[in-house]
Amino acid sequence: MTIREVIELVDRLKPNQYGSADKLRGLSELDGVVWHEIWSAHETAVPAFAGYGLETDLDGTALLIGWPYDEIYRWYLEMKIDDANGEMTKYNNSAAKYNTYYQAYQNAYNRAHMPKGEAAYFRL
């Protein structure tokens, strides 16, 4: 899923007053967390993630998490919108759905990729 697809999906399903730059910042934040907490903790060689900026190609940039877990982006942006609007009941609902997708993705990634090896003992 591309950045523009997520932004258009959220705008269609949850009309809001926030611009693309705010949503881009949220998507960059989420992918940064995914890269740091999940991807970089495994042996798979992944390029460093520098975030998305205003110069990022919204149509040509695919987000880090693919199908079937890509709904995480929708729920993350909806959660951020609900928080900014002070709608705590809606925020809690969006947060629960976001957390479900995040945990499912993390579990699937952990099953499919070997974690970085750590020393089992120290030689003195």
Q: Where are the regions that the model predicts?
A:
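Short secondary-structure subsegments characteristic of cysteine-rich extracellular domains
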Residues: 92-106
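Short amphipathic alpha-helical leader/targeting segments
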Residues: 44, 91-92
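Elongated alpha-helical scaffolds
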Residues: 67-80
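Generic alpha-helical propensity signal that fires on short helical segments
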Residues: 87, 95-99, 116
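Short helix-capping/linker segments at secondary-structure and domain boundaries
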Residues: 80-91
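Conserved short "hinge" loops at termini or chain/domain junctions
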Residues: 1-62, 103-124
